[in-house]
């Protein structure tokens, strides 16, 4: 399974990469730090799953998800957040 991780906190993305790569069936193909990079990386790698933070500087995870899904409706995107803001969950 090929995964891309996008998070503006390098500690979070590094920890996720370490945890996921402990499974031999998972390959972290790339990591990024904002929504614009997520869009580029998705097009380049066409991962099985895009694991992305919701809140990032510049283009956030929600906007990036909409853009990716507009071009790749079959995309599987998991959004992460450490915030408990219900407004983001509802979106």
Positions of PLM-derived features:
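Conserved sequence signature across two-component system core domains
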Residues: 6-7, 32, 50
């Amino acid at each position: 399974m090929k995964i891309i991780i996008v998070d503006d906190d390098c500690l979070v993305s590094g920890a996720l990469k370490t945890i996921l790569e402990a499974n031999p069936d998972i390959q972290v193909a790339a990591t990024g730090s904002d929504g614009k990079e997520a869009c580029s990386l998705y097009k380049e790698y066409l991962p099985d799953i895009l694991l992305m933070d919701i809140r990032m500087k510049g283009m956030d995870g929600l906007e990036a998800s909409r853009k990716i899904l507009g071009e790749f409706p079959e995309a599987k995107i998991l959004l992460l957040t450490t915030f408990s803001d219900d407004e983001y969950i509802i979106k």
